[in-house]
From Swiss-Prot:
PANTHER family associated with the record: 12S RRNA N4-METHYLCYTIDINE METHYLTRANSFERASE (PTHR11265:SF0), S-ADENOSYL-METHYLTRANSFERASE MRAW (PTHR11265)
One Gene Ontology biological process: rRNA base methylation
Family classification: Belongs to the methyltransferase superfamily. RsmH family.
Name of the coding gene: rsmH
Catalytic activity: cytidine(1402) in 16S rRNA + S-adenosyl-L-methionine = N(4)-methylcytidine(1402) in 16S rRNA + S-adenosyl-L-homocysteine + H(+)
HAMAP family referenced in this protein's UniProt entry, alphabetically: 16SrRNA_methyltr_H
Protein name per UniProt: Ribosomal RNA small subunit methyltransferase H
Amino acid sequence: MEFKHVPILLNECIENLNIRDGKIYVDCTVGGAGHSREIAKRIGNGKLICFDQDEDALKVAKQRLEEFGDKIIFIKDNFKNIKNDLHNLGIEKVDGILMDIGVSSYQIDEDSRGFSYMHDADLDMRMDQSNPISAKDIVNTYSKEDLENVIFKYSDEKWAKRIAEFICNARETKPINTTFELVEVIEKAIPKKVRMNQKGHSAKKTFQAIRIEVNKELDVLEQAVGDSIDLLNPEGRICIITFHSLEDKICKDIFRQRQKGCICPPEIPVCVCNHKPEIKIITRKPIEPSKEELEQNSRARSAKLRVAEKII
């Protein structure tokens, strides 16, 4: 299958990265290399470090960026390890970092990856195929309480308790091995009247929650955003595209925390901490896709871009 992934908010990312000749940039999720290609065109004799934990994505990215030669360094790893991986390359500071969070169009559309409730496939959902834990493991081994917690926490699915109960009941008869088997259980758990009137697919929220749990996406994001800010040179920028409220909240909260000056307790009348703001937030409100982009790519509809600049 052809690796298709249309870069979202491409112009907005390139503009806000403030790319300069000869500097070092990082694409934490190279995917189909749409963003990386535009960055590489603008760095002159600089360097671009491209991360991805998905072997398929890296193969495609290497082909699509081949013309840029040794300007590009590829790293097969989860971007939560950005600080250590760059250190191993002898790089302690960089000038811009891009994160495009979440699952790629290729991963959704490739049946064998098991991300989609629209294609029947083995229940997988691993972004990194070397990850020992798949969606099948979670669905068939987590307790009812743990399943309910995962589904509600990561998707705000109000039928989480009932879905967890139905999953546990179904797997007593036989394991739930495929995406369509899981969809069938979810649809039985949600009352028909509700399903008939709700927007979107009945399984969408549960699949999102399980995918986040499989890949520990929110833990990874929290670690990576904090470390990325540490890695930036003064005037370096971090651009983060998120696709749901949990991701966006993590980024917003970390940006606000790192923008703070004094962190003394309120009862202390005079600052003694000497804490200085580390960043300034460039996007007071997140940038969202234009009407024109949404007409061309409906998968961009929930995207939000937040940008911050290192000041010390």
